[in-house]
């Protein structure tokens, strides 16, 4: 078994190779959105202007060709389905992701349990004319064992208390180079309602570490992968700070 309560500074596919089957209780993640791919004259091309506003990755411009982006997600999701029970996969439908994401939904339809609409309450004005402002994102829920049923085997909410549209404000920036930070409230809602204390939570695209920080606060074990060294250092700092807070709280 891979060492838990640890973040690995590597590609998530390398981490997943070392994770045994059915050993992750819950996955919460938000992969890159392929923000820097656009359409010009009916063809996909790299979009330079957005790079000033989008998340910065080491050695990765977030502009994969659609087929490569699709293959990447498919490979990751198949590994997550092998290792995990329930997967919450947050993605925004943008030009560079749209075709790939809907193709993935079709390819993995046997494992798609439900979809949550995350309403962030505010949308940046669109950068082009005649385009919707994007206020919402999708959270695709995959179930490796019993996706055909709408019931969740491990659920801590009562009948009629949880909707499929979640109104949660976007997360606050932890570092200037990462624009798409998970809000703690979103992660907390998922962890509290779909896992128990002591469960193992995995985030293959850890970003600035919100999944690990919230898991620690809620007495869950965590595991994460993050390829970008800068974000890896941010995660370490946040987890050290959270350990200090928890230690002091226990000794008051």
Predicted regions and their residues:
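Short, conserved SAM-binding/catalytic segment
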Residues: 1-3, 236-252
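Core catalytic lobe of class I
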Residues: 2-234
């Amino acid at each position: 078994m891979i060492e838990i309560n640890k973040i690995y500074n590597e590609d998530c596919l390398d981490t997943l190779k070392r994770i045994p089957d059915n050993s992750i209780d819950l996955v919460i993640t938000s992969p890159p959105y392929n923000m820097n791919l656009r359409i010009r004259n009916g063809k996909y091309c790299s979009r330079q202007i957005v790079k000033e506003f989008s998340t910065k990755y080491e050695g990765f411009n977030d502009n994969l060709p659609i087929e490569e982006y699709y293959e990447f997600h498919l490979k990751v999701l198949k590994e997550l389905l092998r290792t995990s029970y329930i997967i919450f996969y947050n993605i925004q439908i943008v030009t560079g992701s749209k075709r790939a994401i809907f193709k993935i939904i079709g390819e993995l339809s046997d494992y798609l349990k439900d979809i949550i609409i995350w309403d962030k309450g505010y949308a940046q004005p669109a950068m082009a004319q005649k385009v919707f402002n994007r206020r919402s994102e999708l959270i695709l829920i995959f179930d490796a064992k019993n996706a055909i049923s709408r019931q969740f085997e491990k659920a801590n909410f009562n009948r009629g208390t949880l909707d499929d549209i979640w109104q949660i404000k976007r997360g606050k920036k932890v570092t200037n180079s990462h624009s798409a930070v998970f809000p703690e409230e979103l992660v907390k809602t998922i962890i509290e309602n779909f896992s128990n204390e002591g469960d193992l939570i995995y985030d293959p695209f850890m970003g600035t570490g919100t999944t690990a920080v919230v898991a620690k606060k809620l007495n869950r074990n965590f595991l994460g992968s993050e390829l970008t060294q800068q974000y890896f250092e941010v995660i370490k700092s946040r987890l050290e700070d959270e350990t200090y807070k928890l230690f002091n709280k226990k000794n008051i």
